[in-house]
Amino acid sequence: MNYTILVTGPPYGTQNSSTAFLFCQSLLKTKHILHSVFFYCDGVLNANNMTTPAIDEFNLINAWQGLNKKHQVKLYVCNSAALRRGVIEDEKLFNMNVKKGNLALSFQLSGLIELAKSIKICDRIIQF
């Protein structure tokens, strides 16, 4: 089966994102196809490279990046939701008084059109 995952929860404070990550790992271990992960609403905070968990806590942002590197899973971040929550890529800074963006590597800003395309080609979409 071909899956798209929609993450709407932040990396910390709820279990949405960590459960989504564990589900993605399970999908890949059982040889399903994970087309993409789309971060929306507070889920865009998973792409904030300024998030710094305690040293003894699981670093979910690094885990998502590892999933991208190891399995080439696309990590899409809703552009509008990201801007509302202060997640900005370096290329968007020319209109703002900010020196450096905080969009983590491996994540890419996109619109809802990417989510729609993913839904169209996948067998299942699951929201966390």
From Swiss-Prot:
Residue numbers annotated as active site: C78
Compartments in which it is found: Cytoplasm
Keyword annotations: Cytoplasm, Transferase, tRNA processing
Keyword Transferase: yes
Enzyme class: transferase
GO molecular function: sulfur carrier activity; sulfurtransferase activity
A biological-process GO annotation: tRNA wobble position uridine thiolation
Top-rank taxon, per record: Bacteria
Pfam entry (one): DsrE
Transmembrane segments: none
E.C. numbers: 2.8.1.-
GO cellular component: sulfurtransferase complex
Complex and partners: Heterohexamer, formed by a dimer of trimers. The hexameric TusBCD complex contains 2 copies each of TusB, TusC and TusD. The TusBCD complex interacts with TusE.
Entry similarity comment: Belongs to the DsrE/TusD family.
NCBIfam families cross-referenced by the UniProt entry: PRK00207.1, sulf_tusD_dsrE
Functional summary from the UniProt entry: Part of a sulfur-relay system required for 2-thiolation of 5-methylaminomethyl-2-thiouridine (mnm(5)s(2)U) at tRNA wobble positions. Accepts sulfur from TusA and transfers it in turn to TusE.
Protein name: Sulfurtransferase TusD
